[in-house]
């Protein structure tokens, strides 16, 4: 049964379930319709580069629902490809559930087939605090709008908090030749950006087997006291987490002060940026061409414009029983 709840004045769709065990399903998207469910998802349309000097234009046309070519399962697909589009040399996709679906504690899992990232792709499944002001443009606007943001109950990054459940494509994996097994989880927080000197914690993992090209399960378990992330819990239920962070410290600048409110979901497939060490020459450039020195290093996108695809089979959110 589906019911509509109100959380912080936000319409949030939640599914109830009679599933057995420690966890009960409270929301999911199985991506089985003909089109994306926009009651849940916002599709981004911009060239801001995520604040990370990325190279792509995020275009709504690059978000599709398709059958996986091998499994036949209906999936959300994020497509990245070479094409000159709105002053960018490539396009890709990013979408989020801001102000539509939020999570506060519980278990979040996603079954995803990440693409082969080397060299230059940066896919991620992550979360941001739902109190984030999303319409700022770039960081230059923050000081001018501080009072207005406070009145709206909004904050700027990283005060909202960020939970990166899985990222791939880091330059270390490229350098070590382990890019198909190298991934990480991370958290970011703090009162202000502070020229990059904000608190954060990340843990990198080199898996025993490839985690690109095929489906794998990525799980976040989040309580008032801790955050933990797991790979393939369905196959390896006793495996140790690849990321752990204590939230017991609740003072300002301690993580427990920032990860105690609703967060929304984000999926994206970036091209270039700081993470793979292929950034644009400027953080917010007006124009990037195919002659850009960083774009010249991107080998993961076929020269003929064939899309590279990130498949998402499902995302599910659970709460503990009792």
Language-model features, listed with the residues they occupy:
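Sec-dependent signal peptide recognition
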Residues: 2-8
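Hydrophobic h-region of N-terminal signal peptides that target proteins for export
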Residues: 9-19
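GH16 jelly-roll
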Residues: 20-322
